[in-house]
Amino acid sequence: MREIVHIQGGQCGNQIGAKFWEVVSDEHGIDPTGTYHGDSDLQLERINVYFNEATGGRYVPRAILMDLEPGTMDSVRSGPYGQIFRPDNFVFGQTGAGNNWAKGHYTEGAELIDSVLDVVRKEAESCDCLQGFQVCHSLGGGTGSGMGTLLISKIREEYPDRMMLTFSVVPSPKVSDTVVEPYNATLSVHQLVENADECMVLDNEALYDICFRTLKLTTPTFGDLNHLISAVMSGITCCLRFPGQLNADLRKLAVNLIPFPRLHFFMVGFTPLTSRGSQQYRALTVPELTQQMWDAKNMMCAADPRHGRYLTASALFRGRMSTKEVDEQMLNVQNKNSSYFVEWIPNNVKSSVCDIPPKGLKMSATFIGNSTAIQEMFKRVSEQFTAMFRRKAFLHWYTGEGMDEMEFTEAESNMNDLVSEYQQYQDASAEEEGEFEGEEEEA
């Protein structure tokens, strides 16, 4: 029916993706060999959103795995669900991008991109009615950011009317893996603003905080972080995969969340998050879920929604619950915290309800918010970018791959424009508009 083709690129993307397929396979009752061992017809009814049925009743993920070095893919292949993927869908080079966006976008990545696109076409052709693509990648490295954005722009050319959803891990404020992260991230955002439809912004630091504070894990691993991300990824598409009372799909989400085409960077959250010890002491109710869902500590990227205002938001509930109660709770949030919502978009929270909760929970909720506070994150990256670019530090790595300084300047100003657009709508109020119109008439 409404298929989604999943693409994961680079080390970060492949690790998130691997975790995501564990979660989705588990939800649909698929074991690591691709065989169905579920207990409900609902698991199979729309399994083809993410899986292809192959010969002998095997289910194969519609996933494309790409990287410029074989390392991460080998570990995916030898991981718990490594044997479920179609072997031809592993596309990798041998050189690596060395955290260099230019290598991923212009040199090494460009050599590999055609073989990736062949696999993309093959997957898209086997779809009955393709809904869109979802891409997992990070913006700080070389492959996920450089080659990831190259692939997104190529897919955009070939499938202009399909949704393009990304799960992008941005560099964290305090934890840095690479010195050139600000360069790679800025060049990537420059691409994502133009070519993606919806970007779910994630960052490791916010995810670590959730693991420490909420889940009370003393030594969180990347596996724990990726598990959080995959909970959100599964929540976003659950309406496509399971029956529900109020459905949402990628396009409905976009229509409800994006008031202006460039402002499509979202904060995401998932509830309930409880530490293992205190799980059994919590009753799960719609008000409880709603409360945790809107909590700033619950956001998976390091921007504080209380520093901005929500343009729009979307809540995707899962489980048996009354839609009336969901609507009441959502209205309640908007009425009590009206200063955090822009008043010139009335009823700007969309909710949907899917009947089937995730494994092991009675009910859950996924939150997607389009908040002007996300500019904090862009601002932070932009400041680090400018600090280095002013001195032209590390630039030779990029110009050596044939890039021009001009491209850096363009990316920088595009990012700064984005920040000021968010600021402009944060400050806008319903009344102001009238005054301007009046002045124009007089003139």
Curated annotation (Swiss-Prot):
Misc remark: The 2 beta-tubulin genes of Chlamydomonas (beta-1 and beta-2) encode the same protein.
Top-rank taxon: Eukaryota
Cysteine-cysteine disulfides: none
Positions that bind Mg(2+): 69
Natural source organism: Chlamydomonas reinhardtii
GO BP annotations, alphabetical order: microtubule-based process
Keywords from the named record: Cytoplasm, Cytoskeleton, GTP-binding, Magnesium, Metal-binding, Microtubule, Nucleotide-binding
GO molecular function, one term: GTP binding
Co-factor(s): Mg(2+)
Binding, GTP: 11, 69, 138, 142-144, 204, 226
Stretch list, region Disordered: 424-443
Protein name from the UniProt record: Tubulin beta-1/beta-2 chain
GO cellular component: a single term: cytoplasm
Biased composition (Acidic residues): 429-443
CDD domains from the UniProt entry: beta_tubulin
Chief place where the protein resides: cytoplasm
Free-text function comment from the UniProt entry: Tubulin is the major constituent of microtubules, a cylinder consisting of laterally associated linear protofilaments composed of alpha- and beta-tubulin heterodimers. Microtubules grow by the addition of GTP-tubulin dimers to the microtubule end, where a stabilizing cap forms. Below the cap, tubulin dimers are in GDP-bound state, owing to GTPase activity of alpha-tubulin.
Family listed: Belongs to the tubulin family.
